[in-house]
């Protein structure tokens, strides 16, 4: 719903947000998974943003002095998104193991936010060992639960993540926020 997106961008700007985040996927580019048969594929088809929708969102963000940010689910969509804005990209938790996507994102964007809700400590090492500019990487503590109750936020993990990489943040689905 583009009208709702426009309202959300305006509210994000009013609240002082730096970014307004969306999600980018093309259903035809999604890898196979449980969503093929559990009903989510129909939702993904309805919620897929067209190229024109993306361009409109970028323009609305600029108009409202907030930066456009999107989560990317497939390397095939990376080139298109980078033509709209090369400011930043977000790698969702379930793509944290996709080192090819992370590497390509670092080549095309100034900042790469990586949600690490599904990340094991060994995976942090693999990311940090990539031949990339680590100053572009921001690890975002995230608990992959929808919605998330406050007692499960686990903010101490944020401090643990900061011990291995100083640029950290929080990306959450906190109930009521």
PLM regions with names:
Residues 1-177:
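Catalytic cores and adjacent flexible loops of soluble metabolic enzymes
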């Amino acid at each position: 719903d583009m009208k709702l997106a426009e309202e959300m961008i305006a509210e994000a700007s009013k609240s002082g947000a730096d970014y307004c985040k969306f999600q980018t996927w093309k259903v035809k580019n999604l890898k196979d998974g449980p969503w093929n048969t559990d009903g989510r594929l129909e939702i993904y088809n309805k919620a897929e943003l067209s190229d024109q929708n993306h361009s409109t969102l970028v323009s609305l963000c600029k108009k409202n002095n907030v930066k456009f940010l999107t989560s990317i689910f497939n390397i095939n969509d990376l080139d298109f998104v980078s033509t709209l804005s090369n400011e930043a990209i977000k790698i969702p938790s379930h793509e944290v193991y996709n080192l090819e996507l992370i590497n390509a994102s670092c080549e095309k964007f100034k900042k790469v936010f990586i949600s690490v809700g599904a990340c094991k400590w060994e995976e942090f090492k693999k990311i940090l060992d990539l031949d990339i500019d680590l100053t572009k990487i921001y690890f975002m503590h995230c608990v992959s639960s929808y919605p998330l109750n406050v007692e499960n936020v686990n903010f101490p993990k944020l401090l643990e993540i900061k011990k291995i990489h100083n640029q950290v943040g929080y990306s959450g689905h906190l109930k009521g926020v």
